[in-house]
């Protein structure tokens, strides 16, 4: 169901603002509405969050992979007390990070210098002495290998040194000749490069740079080791990060408030069933306040909160993946949950797969204690596994083995499955179509009820019930083939005809002229084809159920009838073969189960979204986002 909401208005003294916001945050009950500029007080809190996030990311490469397990628990006060010590750790990490960055910059600078000097290693002259004089032009640089010959022919004195694709070149010529041969030198691709203030020979500088690079690399290793030593502190930083995020959210909430020098005003949305709890929390802090709860006004952007029984709540994940219902409309979650449960089991339809899935999801919920969407998805899979256990017995297999094989020689040999998809595909298709028609009729009845609730009687009859009558009438035409009286088919014919006439005449009742109404009605009658298409959509239940069983049987045949048979003849080989085939068979079945589960989840959801929700559901709801503890690493007690 959609929880009724109230609009909260609270006025209190400014000195109690922090305590009141902490109390509201602790009960996670109020979504604030911005009513003014407020004060921009969250910059410092956001800065703390950013610093802690950066520190956590910095330590990630040095920390081991997170193990599976429930989140640790802590109180808000404990998390907030961790912030200052963690910020001190951040300061040390930031210092190390700066030194590592500087080290990297210095190392790269020396590597570049080393690379530029290596081609000159054979030149014995000190680099500071290689320069032009009053009468001689001296140039050092590089020339492409293909330009060497042309450079030698320019008329300048050229001395070549090391290099592969590019050669280091010392070019000397009289000053008075330089202007004439400079264009020829440039045409060879010669790029002049100076040694700057480097002193000593190239080989001496190469050795110096290599020594400095080695020292820098050793220093970097030490810095990295010091950084790695902080890895155990990562959990402390994570706790502090959650505490800082709580502070940040509370500080940001202040920006939504209006205030004077002595008082503040707060408005927001609160669940109707939480109003008294909000009042009690405020009364614990002060008795000087004004608090009012009002019903939403028309045009208000009211957030949507879903509340269902423990059994139905997991299916809210399926609804949320589609869209929350608009506030004041129908929550489709409890309405579609039984069908999702049944269809999922029929699609997976293998008892062993269902048992493994249910146990795995149960263990995930019990020991890892997920929250939010992950918890609900695990709940859906657990219930889907339970459904699969029974549907596998009724319509499917057991780890790819047919039930007649398992029950061979017993009284149940010809009892299960009730319908075998592989031997009676038409029977299974009829069952799927019947479930589909029931599913869609149920959706139309919900839409009819909604119309009656809003006193739209014509909508209830023409837009909804007439389609049930039309489809039912068409189905009744098959009555004689089922051994029923022809009068049933005759009644169905007239039921469909009368309903079709009503749709033709009144489906376009919103049009002002008769011609427009009739044209609209004729177009509406064409929707009968979409009904037929929707019924065919339920064939996917048969298709996925059949594929699960057939592929499971193929895996068993490959592993046991073919691969294991190749080991027969030698007892030792048979033992080795049995182990290999068992491991391979289990691995293949697990892989098959995972792939099939994904397909079942998606296709079952698709049937709810298109064939079911499409007939009555009003999407577009906005999620309720109260001020609360939005933590990532720790559950707040």
How should each PLM-predicted stretch be described?
Residues 1-6, 18-21, 25-32, 276-637:
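Conserved, carboxylate-rich catalytic/transport cores that coordinate ions
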Residues 1-336, 364, 371-374, 378:
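Long, charged N-terminal accessory/stalk domains
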């Amino acid at each position: 169901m959609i929880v009724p909401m109230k609009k909260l208005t609270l006025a209190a003294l400014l000195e109690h603002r922090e305590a009141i916001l902490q109390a509201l945050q602790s009960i996670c009950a109020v979504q604030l509405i911005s009513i003014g500029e407020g004060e921009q007080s969250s910059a410092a809190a956001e800065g703390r969050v950013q610093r802690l996030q950066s520190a956590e990311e910095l330590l990630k490469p040095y920390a081991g992979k997170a193990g599976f397990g429930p989140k640790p628990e802590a109180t808000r006060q404990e998390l907030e007390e961790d912030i200052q010590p963690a910020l001190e750790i951040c300061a040390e990490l930031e210092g190390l990070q700066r030194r590592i960055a500087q080290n990297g910059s210095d190392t790269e600078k020396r590597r570049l210098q080393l690379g530029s000097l290596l081609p000159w290693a054979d030149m014995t002259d000190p680099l500071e002495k290689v320069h032009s004089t009053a009468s001689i032009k001296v140039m050092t640089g590089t020339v492409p290998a293909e330009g060497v010959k042309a450079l030698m022919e320019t008329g300048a004195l050229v001395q070549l040194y090391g290099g592969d694709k590019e050669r280091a070149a010392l070019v000397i010529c009289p000053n008075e000749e330089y202007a004439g041969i400079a264009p020829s030198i440039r045409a060879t691709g010669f790029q002049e490069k100076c040694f700057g203030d480097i002193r000593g020979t190239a080989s001496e500088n190469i050795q110096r740079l290599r020594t400095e690079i080695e020292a820098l690399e050793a220093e970097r290793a030490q810095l990295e080791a010091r950084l790695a030593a902080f890895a155990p502190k990562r959990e402390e930083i994570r706790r502090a990060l959650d505490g800082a995020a709580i502070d940040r959210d509370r500080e940001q909430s202040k920006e939504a408030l209006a205030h004077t020098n002595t008082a503040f005003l707060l408005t927001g949305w609160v669940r109707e069933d939480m109003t008294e709890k909000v009042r009690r929390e405020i009364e614990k802090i002060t008795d000087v306040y004004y608090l009012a709860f009002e019903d939403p006004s028309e045009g208000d952007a009211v957030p949507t909160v879903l509340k269902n029984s423990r059994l139905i709540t997991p299916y809210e994940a399926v609804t949320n993946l589609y869209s929350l219902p608009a506030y004041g409309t129908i929550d489709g979650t409890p309405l579609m949950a039984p069908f999702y449960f049944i269809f999922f089991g029929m699609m997976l339809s293998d008892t062993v797969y269902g048992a493994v899935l249910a146990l795995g999801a149960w263990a995930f919920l019990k020991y890892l204690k997920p929250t939010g969407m992950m918890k609900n998805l695990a709940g859906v899979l657990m219930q889907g596994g339970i459904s699969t256990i029974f549907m596998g017995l009724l319509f499917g297999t057991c780890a790819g083995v047919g039930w007649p094989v398992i029950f061979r020689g017993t009284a149940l040999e010809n009892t299960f499955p009730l319908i075998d998809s592989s031997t009676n595909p038409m029977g299974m298709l009829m069952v799927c179509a019947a479930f589909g028609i029931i599913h869609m009729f149920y959706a139309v009845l919900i839409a009819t009820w909604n119309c009656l609730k809003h006193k739209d009687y014509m909508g209830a009859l023409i837009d909804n019930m007439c389609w049930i009558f039309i489809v039912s009438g068409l189905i009744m035409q098959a009555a004689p083939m089922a051994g029923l009286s022809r009068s049933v088919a005759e009644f169905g014919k007239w039921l469909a005809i009368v309903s079709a006439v009503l749709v033709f005449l009144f489906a376009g009742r919103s049009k002002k002229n008769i011609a427009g109404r009739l044209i609209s009605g004729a177009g509406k009658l064409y929707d009968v084809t979409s009904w037929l298409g929707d019924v065919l959509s339920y064939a996917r239940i048969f298709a996925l159920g059949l594929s699960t069983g057939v592929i499971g049987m193929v895996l068993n045949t490959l592993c046991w009838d073919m691969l294991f048979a190749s080991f027969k003849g030698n007892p030792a080989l048979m033992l080795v073969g049995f182990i290999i085939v068992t491991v391979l068979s289990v691995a293949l079945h697990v892989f098959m189960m995972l792939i099939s589960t994904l397909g079942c989840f998606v296709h079952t959801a698709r049937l709810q979204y298109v064939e079911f929700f499409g007939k009555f559901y009003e999407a577009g709801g906005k999620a309720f986002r109260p001020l609360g503890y939005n933590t990532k690493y720790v559950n707040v007690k």
